[in-house]
C-alpha cells in the first residue's frame, strides 16, 4: 500500500486543509475570516501560513501543532495581547514572523534555543518591554522592526557584536525613547553596524526624554550625550539610609525610579526596602557608584497596584507600599516593571529634519553624478527632486534609489548645470534644500605606468601593465598587432580594472606588438611593448621542420585516428551486449556521420601536434630551460604550419550555413539546427558548435591536457585528488532523505529539458591513438583515454575484474575545431573546446531532432496531416514512439530477453536511457498528434507541413512556459529567479544564448543529487503495482518494460506521487549511482559522481572558488572560511583531507556541498550559473513564446494556461487524478489530487485561420527554385515519399493499401513509404 510505503521511508504527513481556510500547495490562507482561535489540523508540510485580519487575542503553543516546515507566519492585524514564552519551539524552521498591528504589550523569550528567524515585524503594537534575549536568540536575524510602540529603553546587551555580520535592517522610530545611559549599548551597536557596511539601516528615531534632548535625532548624538542622573543620598528620621533620584523633569508624569550600575540595572546583595516615592532604603550605607533613571508614565495612566503572579506573560507589577525587599526581590527588578494602560501615546514631534544635505558640487562631462538628500520625521517623509524648479522623474537619464533619497544622473552634460532642489514632505510638513551643480574641467588621459618590452621562454607566464590617469577616469583597452583583445574566451586574462594583461603560457605566436590604449571622453593615450618568445628554440624548430615533414605528420595522424575509429566500430559489432553499460557505449558511438567528421577533425589535429612533439624531441637536443613543462608543441610551430595541419585534418570546414532567404518561413518557424534565429549573430545557439565559456579553461598545458593528466603534478601545493576517491569519501551515501514538498517529476523534467539543450560530442573511439590499445585495457593517460585509477582499498577491486588494469574506463569527450573567428588572435593557439551537438535554444529539439533529416525520420509523411509516426499503440489505443530501424542502437541486444523489442526512436538519442524519460517522450509524442489533429479540424486549408510546424512551434512554447513558470522558481528559489532571471522584457539580439560549458558539464548535473534509488510505479489507486517499484539499475535501456509492465501510467504516477531525494551535503548521491550505475549481475558498475568530476577536468573547468568569484560571492581562503558556506563540519573536514586547499575544489563537488539558498535545491554558485544560462536562453531567443511577434495575444493567453499536469492527464492511458502543480509533492494523501477535467485546458480554436498565408508549400518550392540547396531539395522530396510502392510475398502494393497478413483478420498491414507496417487489431487484443 502507498501509506505503508511512505511510512517505511519516514513520511507521515497530515494534509487536511482546515475548513475555514484555503490551501494552495504548501500555503494555507486564513486571512479575513473573523477567527478568534487558530483552527486545528493545519497540514504538517505547510511552509507559509497567513492569519492576518482576524480577531485572535493570544498566542500559545497549544494553539498550534508542531509545524517543522513552516517558514512564514503572518499574524498581522489581529488583537493579540499575550504571547506564550518559547512559542517558536513549535516552528523550528520559521524565518519570517509578522506580528504588526496588534495590541502586544510585552514580548517574552520566543525560543529555548537559537531559532531560525530572519525577519521579525512588531510594528504598531503597545509594547513597552522586550525580553533581553529576543534578538540574540535569533542568530540569522536580518530585519527587526518595532516602530510606533511604547518602548522607552532596551535591556542592556539587547544588541551584541555577534549580530553585526547578519543584522541588516533595524527600524525603531515612533517610540518615546529615553536617551540616557541605558541607550549607550544601542549607540555602540549602531556605530558597529554602520562600520561593517554603509548599506545597513539602523533607525532609532528621536528622543522624547530628557527634555534637553527632546526631538534630537538619536543617530546624531554622541555617547557623551547619553547621561543618567546622579542619585541623592539622605538619612531618614528613623536612621535608614535613603537613595533617591532627582525628579526635576517629572511634572505631569507618574514614574518609577530605576537604579543602574555601569549603565545596567543594578543587582544587589544587601537587603533593601522600597519607599512609596520609589527611593531605596537600606540599614547600611550605599557603597557602590550608582546612577538613576526613570520609567515615565503620563498623568492619565491608571496604575495597577497589585503584584501579579510571576507566571504571567507580562512582567509582575511592583508594589508602592513600603516593605522589606530581599535579595531575590531586588534581583527581579531586572525583569519586572510596572504594567500600564496608556490612553494616549506621548506626542512625537512631526518636524522634518534633513539628516544629510547635498552640498554644492561639480561634475565632468559624460560621468555619472550622484546626489543625496536624507530626511527624517514622523511620518517618514518622501523626497522629491527638482532641477531649475522642474520636477525630475525616473528615466533612462535620471535614476532614483534608496526610496528616492539618491538621484543618479548619467551622462552628466552641459545642460545639467544649474540649481537643484530636494523637497522632503510627509503630509504634515514640507522642507526643501537648494544647492548648485557646476561643470568641472576634464583631463586628457596620460599613461603613468607603461608596458615594458619583454623576452620570454615558451610556456612562461607574462604580465604586462598599463595604468593611466585622467578625468573622466580613462578606460584601458588592450590590442595585439592592432586587433583588440576580448575579455573572455581567449588565453589572455585582463584584470577587472583593465590595468594588467596576463598570458598564462606564452607561445611563439604571442611574439609581436602589444598596445594599451587609455580612452576617455576628452581624448586618448597609447603605449606599446614588444614581446619576443622563445627566439632561440623557434629558430631551431624552423630548421628541423619543412612543408613535406608537416604533410607526412598530418597523413600519419589521420591514419591513426581513422584506424582507431574503425577498430572501435568493428569491436562494437562483435561485442556481446549483456548490460545497460554495454548498450550505453553502443549509443555513445552510434552518432550521425556528419557529427563524427566534425569531432574527428579535431582529434586528427591534436594527434598531429603529438607527432610533431615526437619529431622535435627526437631531432633536437635542447635545454629544458628553453621551454616550460606541460606546454603543447603547437606553441613552437609557425602559424603557416598550424594552418596546414588544420586544413589537412579537416578542421577548417564547419557547419553548413543556411541562407535564411525564406523570410516567410523563418519569420514564423525555427530551423532545426538553430540557424536563422539571430540575424546579427548567426552562429549563436546553433547545433554542432562549441560551448561558450564563462571563464577561460584550466588545462594542464594551457592547451588541451586536463588537470591530473600528469601524475604527481601539484596545484597550490597539492595534487588534485583521485575522482573515485572523492566519490567514495564524500559523495556516495547509503542513506537518503525524501524531500518534504517536491515531487520526483522535478528531477524528471530537469532531465527532459537538459536533453533538449545539451549533448556533448563524445569521444570517437575507445582506442588509444598512441598505442592502439583499448581504453579499458590500459591505465595510461593517452588520448582519448583518461581512465580513473582505482585505489587499493576500493571495493571494485574485490570483483577481480580490475586486477590487471585497476582503473575505471573513461574516454575524453570530442573537441571542436575552433571558434570560426578569423582574427589573428584566434589563428594562433586555441585551447580545446567541446562540441554541443544540439541547439542551445529551448525549442523541443528533444522531440523533433536537431536536423531536418531527423525530423523527417520521425514524421508520418503518409497522411500529410502533420503527425509524428508510431508503430504500436497501448491498450488505450494511444501510440508509443516508433522503433529504430536502421541504427546500430538495438535494445534487443540488452540482457532482458523475455520480451525483446527494438529501441524507441525520438528526437534525442538518449530517449531510451531510463523508463521515466521514455514516458515523457511518449507523452509529448501523443500531445503533438493530439494538437495536430485538432489544428487540422479547425484549419482545413492547412497542409501537413503547416500543421506540423505550427504544432512544433506550440509544443516548444509549452516547454518554455512550464520550465520558466513552474519548474525554475522551485529549483532556483523564487528570490534567485526574480533577481537574476526576472520578468521578460523582450528579445535582445546581443544576448548570447549559447550553452555554457560550465552549465552543461557541472551546474545542471546538480539534478543527480535529486535521484531516488528506485523508480516508483503506482496503480490507479496509488498503490504499488504488482510488478513493484523498479530499482534504478534495472530501469536503464529497457523499453520492453514500458510496453509489457503497465505502460506509461504507473511510471508517471510514480513521478508525481512520490518525492524527490532531498539534496544534502552529507547525502549527495545515492549509491545506486556511485556503486551500481549500469550494473548487471557480474558487470562492474560505473560511478556517476567520479564521472562528473573527471568530466569537469576533461573540459578544463576552473575550480569552484573561481566561479564563486565570477558570481560575486565570498571566496573562502581558509577552511575556517568554509563554515558559512558549507555549514557541515564533517563535510568541510572531508574536503580538506581530499583537496588540501579550497582553491583546488572541483566545481561540481563544491557546488553540491554548498549550503542551499532559501527555497532552492542548490547553493548559490550553481544557482548563479543555471540562472545566468536560462536568462540568456530566454532573452537571446527570437522565437521565445512571449515575444509579441510569435503568437497573438489570444494565443498567448491560452499558452499561459498550459500545465504539465493537464498534458499528462490528456495523454496518459488512464490517469484521472493529479495535483494542479505537478512539481509539488503532497505526501501520502490523495486529497490534493484534482479530477483531470477540472484543470484548465488550452483552447486551440485560437489557432483558427481562414485566409492565413502559408509558408510551407509555396515558400519551400520557391527556395528550391532560388537556391537549389540540399536542404530545400529534401523538403521537396518529402511530398513524393508516399508514391513509393511495396512488395509483399511477390505482390506489388500501392502506397496506402491495407490488407490482412496471411489472411489473419487480427493482423492488418499497410504500405507506407515503400515499407510494410503491420499491427494487431484492438478487438483481437481484447479477445486475448
Swiss-Prot record:
Q: Which residues form a coiled coil?
A: none
Q: What is its main location?
A: secreted
Q: State the LRR repeat positions.
A: 42-66, 67-90, 92-114, 116-137, 138-161, 164-191, 1085-1109, 1204-1225
Cofactor(s) listed: Ca(2+); heme b
UniProt-reported outcome of changing residue 853 to K? In ju358; 31% embryonic and 47% larval lethality. Variably abnormal epidermal morphology (vab phenotype) in 21% of remaining offspring
Q: Which reaction does it catalyse?
A: L-lysyl-[collagen] + L-methionyl-[collagen] + H2O2 = [collagen]-L-lysyl-N-S-L-methionyl-[collagen] + 2 H2O + H(+); bromide + H2O2 = hypobromite + H2O; L-lysyl-[collagen] + L-methionyl-[collagen] + hypobromite = [collagen]-L-lysyl-N-S-L-methionyl-[collagen] + bromide + H2O + H(+); L-tyrosyl-[protein] + bromide + H2O2 + H(+) = 3-bromo-L-tyrosyl-[protein] + 2 H2O
Q: Where does Ca(2+) bind?
A: 756, 839, 841, 843, 845
Q: Which GO terms describe its molecular function?
A: heme binding; lactoperoxidase activity; metal ion binding; peroxidase activity
Free-text comment on the cofactor: Binds 1 Ca(2+) ion per heterodimer. Binds 1 heme b (iron(II)-protoporphyrin IX) group covalently per heterodimer.
Q: Where is this site: Transition state stabilizer?
A: 910
Position of the signal peptide: 1-16
Please name the catalytic residues of this protein: 755 (proton acceptor)
User: Keywords in UniProt for this one?
Assistant: Basement membrane, Disulfide bond, Extracellular matrix, Glycoprotein, Heme, Iron, Leucine-rich repeat, Metal-binding, Oxidoreductase, Peroxidase, Repeat, Secreted, Signal
Cystine links in this protein are 373-422, 466-516, 660-676, 775-785, 779-807, 1111-1168, 1209-1236
Sites carrying sugar chains: 34, 77, 220, 403, 455, 630, 776, 894, 1112, 1128, 1228, 1300
Protein family per UniProt: Belongs to the peroxidase family. XPO subfamily.
| Function statement | Catalyzes the two-electron oxidation of bromide by hydrogen peroxide and generates hypobromite as a reactive intermediate which mediates the formation of sulfilimine cross-links between methionine and hydroxylysine residues within an uncross-linked collagen IV/COL4A1 NC1 hexamer. Required for embryonic morphogenesis playing a role in epidermal elongation at the twofold stage of embryonic development. Required post-embryonically for basement membrane integrity and muscle-epidermal attachments, and specifically in the function of basement membrane components such as the type IV collagens.
Q: What is this protein called?
A: Peroxidasin homolog pxn-2
Q: What is the lineage of its organism?
A: Eukaryota, Metazoa, Ecdysozoa, Nematoda, Chromadorea
**Gene expressing this chain:** pxn-2
